[in-house]
């Protein structure tokens, strides 16, 4: 390229921060206007004042029907012998080199707002012209600002945004490519000036900061209404704190689902910020720099995760994977401009006095008739043993052996509690116990373990095996011998095991092979905390593996190389993703397993308490978003969901090793024994001072 041309092409905007037009009124400013035209040979002049005067005449005499001739006569008369060139104002827009001839402010406002009447009366228009509006954030805020300017809902507007207009913004911000690289507040101010050069616009091109906050809110008179549309959590909170202190109402449009939020600090000076949804958080901390992760607890209640649209939720799940930022559509932003602009006008005119959050969801309002949802597969009925069934079972089982003991209730309760402390998939605890005729009966409660992904109850068998192991170990700790009979009656498939307790060992009683693990029953737990991987203590796995081998038909293998652990992490991560996007897997996990609150976990005493899963705030927010099956359906359709691979994969990579328990006979008895071996391995690891995190998605 020619160097001269290259130099010319790299020229910058001579006035990137210019946004106020220059107003010339003749004849007073005639010399200045002549100088301008002489100095700007490329200036473009637009003079259609005669047509504006004709419109003005009609606006001032709405009951009169004018012919073309009579209208022209009336327009000339209105000029009162004044030169047309000296009537009104000449407006120069330096950023576009345009000179436009317009009616002066009062008459301009009459004509420009004439079509507002009487949705907005002239008296109301006069009230609106006294209002000062502040707008923070000029993406959605640009739509709100321009909409308010179109209706002339303010006399002064203060615009705050530090960001510049990028090409990717043009999917929703009404502007031209010639404005790329300009500050968004400047772009909006120029558009307002080109609509109405008489409106007062003040730009804060550093955005709203602690340093300029007083000027933004109070300089030249307090704001009447604040429109908050920024992305910064700290500014959202600081701006509301300032608005509350000054008694200024706050309006916010969230764009998604036509969500509109209003806080009337003018009418409710004691109203909590964000309707009280962030009262539990440290609002002082919000004023300090925060990481993206630290912002999450603040953003969750502000954005309303539960009320996001399915497509927004699905897009959030893809952040950092297939999309780079929160999506926004022009239709949503334009709708938001209308909703917020309408609300600001009605607040300014005292026609609306409420606080709250509202939704104008076009996808719900303008929608096809809903088709009935297919009913979810029914679960087995709740487990119940009637007296007649118990009597019949006792007849089938016959009397207990003569050496069986009649245990005190306290002892039975200790045995049952120990059994109930066994691990189970999803912590569903698929067991029921009955003490009768000197024997403890263990039943499989299918209503608790029902899963379409496990139709033959393989996972439940492993959990029941762990339960059996705990009962045997606890009995040994209490000084009893145990004779256990597994799967004793094919006519009663839910009856999994029968335990008799004796004073002395006899043929068929349980061997005392891992009794030293009994104290670990109550200590065993899942630990999902991350730690730097370290080699296992010398001989630890050999001792753990020996505990597994004491169960016939069971063995264990160890993975401890970083390469193997990384491969396992990838495998389990992919399995987690498949499970999460599968409708059945999703429903069973989010509807049946997850316990979202401490209260729910305490009340149900089962399921997965999220508080124990060591989730970061950002991961917890992701879980809340992912709980919507509509979002997951979209994620699957887009072939996304990579984020689900991060549920277990990072924990595996940060672990020292992984152990796999195997069985030789894959039948129900083999699975029960495998469950016992798994429990032995887990407690043996805890006894070695090792934390354990179960992973099973890749298997099942």
Where are these regions (language model features)?
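E1/E1-like adenylate-forming module used to activate ubiquitin-like modifiers
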Residues: 2-74, 222-331, 362, 366-381
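Acidic, surface-exposed loops and disordered segments
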Residues: 352-700
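Phosphate-binding loop/pocket of nucleotide- and phosphate-handling active sites
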Residues: 2, 8, 56-115, 343-413, ...
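Mid-domain beta-loop-alpha active-site segment that forms a flexible
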Residues: 325-348
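Glycine-rich phosphate-binding loop and adjoining beta1-alpha1-beta2 segment
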Residues: 160-196
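Hydrophobic/small residue at the entry helix of a nucleotide-binding pocket
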Residues: 136, 140-141
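Short amphipathic alpha-helix with an adjacent loop that forms part of the alpha/beta core around
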Residues: 211-221
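Conserved S-adenosyl-L-methionine
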Residues: 150-156, 176
């Amino acid at each position: 390229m020619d160097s001269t041309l290259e130099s010319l092409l790299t020229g910058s905007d001579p006035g990137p921060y210019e946004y106020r037009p220059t107003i010339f009124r003749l004849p007073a400013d005639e010399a200045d206007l002549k100088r301008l035209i002489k100095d700007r040979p490329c200036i473009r002049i637009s003079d259609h004042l005669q047509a504006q005067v004709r419109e003005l005449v009609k606006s001032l005499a709405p009951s009169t029907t004018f012919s073309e001739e009579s209208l022209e006569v009336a327009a000339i008369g209105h000029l009162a012998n004044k030169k047309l060139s000296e009537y009104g104002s000449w407006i120069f827009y330096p950023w576009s080199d345009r000179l436009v001839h317009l009616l002066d402010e009062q008459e301009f406002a009459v004509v420009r707002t004439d079509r507002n009447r009487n949705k907005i009366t002239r008296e109301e228009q006069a009230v609106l012209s006294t209002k000062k509006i502040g707008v923070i954030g000029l993406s959605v805020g640009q739509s709100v600002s321009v909409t308010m300017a179109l209706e002339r809902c303010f006399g002064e507007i203060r615009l705050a945004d530090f960001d510049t207009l990028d090409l990717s913004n043009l999917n929703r911000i009404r502007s031209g490519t010639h404005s790329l690289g300009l500050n968004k507040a400047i772009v909006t101010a120029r558009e307002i000036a080109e609509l109405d050069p008489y409106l007062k616009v003040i730009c804060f091109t550093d955005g709203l900061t602690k340093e300029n906050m007083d000027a933004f809110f109070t300089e030249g008179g307090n704001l009447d209404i604040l429109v908050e549309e920024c992305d910064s959590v700290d500014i959202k909170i600081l701006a509301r704190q300032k608005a509350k202190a000054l008694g200024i109402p706050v309006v916010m449009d969230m764009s998604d689902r036509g969500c509109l939020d209003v806080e009337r600090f003018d009418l409710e000076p004691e109203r909590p910020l964000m309707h009280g949804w962030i009262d539990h958080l440290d609002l002082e901390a919000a004023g300090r720099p925060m990481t993206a992760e630290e912002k999450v607890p603040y953003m969750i209640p502000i954005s309303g995760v539960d009320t996001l649209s399915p497509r927004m939720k699905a897009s959030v799940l893809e952040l950092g994977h297939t999309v780079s930022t929160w999506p926004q559509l022009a239709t949503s932003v334009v709708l938001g401009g209308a909703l917020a602009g309408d609300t600001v006008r009605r607040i300014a005119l005292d026609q609306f006095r409420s606080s709250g959050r509202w939704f104008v969801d076009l996808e719900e309002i303008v929608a096809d008739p809903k088709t009935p949802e297919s009913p979810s597969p029914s679960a087995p009925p709740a487990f119940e043993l009637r007296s007649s069934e118990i009597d019949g079972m006792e007849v089938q089982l016959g009397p207990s052996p003569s050496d069986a003991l009649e245990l005190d209730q306290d002892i039975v309760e200790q045995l049952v509690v120990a059994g109930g402390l066994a691990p189970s998939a999803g912590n569903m605890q698929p067991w029921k116990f009955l003490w009768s005729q000197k024997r403890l009966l263990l039943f499989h409660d299918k209503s608790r373990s029902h899963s379409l992904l496990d139709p033959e109850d393989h996972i439940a068998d492993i959990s029941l095996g762990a339960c059996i192991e705990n009962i045997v170990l606890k009995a040994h700790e209490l000084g009893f011998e145990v004779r256990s009979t597994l799967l004793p009656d094919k006519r009663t498939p839910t009856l999994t095991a029968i335990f008799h307790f004796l004073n002395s060992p006899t043929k068929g009683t349980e061997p005392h092979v891992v009794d030293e693990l009994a104290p670990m029953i109550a200590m065993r737990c899942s630990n999902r905390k991350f730690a730097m991987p370290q080699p296992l203590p010398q001989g630890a796995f050999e001792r753990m593996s020996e505990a597994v081998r004491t169960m016939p038909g069971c063995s264990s293998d160890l993975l401890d190389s970083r390469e193997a652990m990384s491969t396992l992490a990838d495998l389990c991560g992919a399995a987690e993703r498949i499970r999460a996007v599968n409708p059945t897997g999703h429903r069973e996990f989010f509807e049946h397993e997850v316990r979202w609150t401490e209260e729910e976990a305490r009340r149900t005493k089962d399921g997965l308490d999220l508080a124990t899963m060591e989730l970061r705030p950002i991961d917890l927010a992701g879980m809340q978003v992912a709980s919507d099956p509509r979002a997951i359906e979209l994620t699957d359709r887009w072939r996304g969901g990579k984020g689900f691979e991060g549920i277990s994969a990072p924990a595996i990579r940060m672990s020292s090793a992984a152990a796999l328990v195997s069985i030789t006979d894959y039948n129900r008895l083999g699975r029960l024994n495998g469950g016992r071996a798994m429990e032995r391995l887990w407690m043996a690891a805890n006894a070695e001072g090792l934390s354990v995190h179960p992973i099973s998605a890749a298997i099942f």
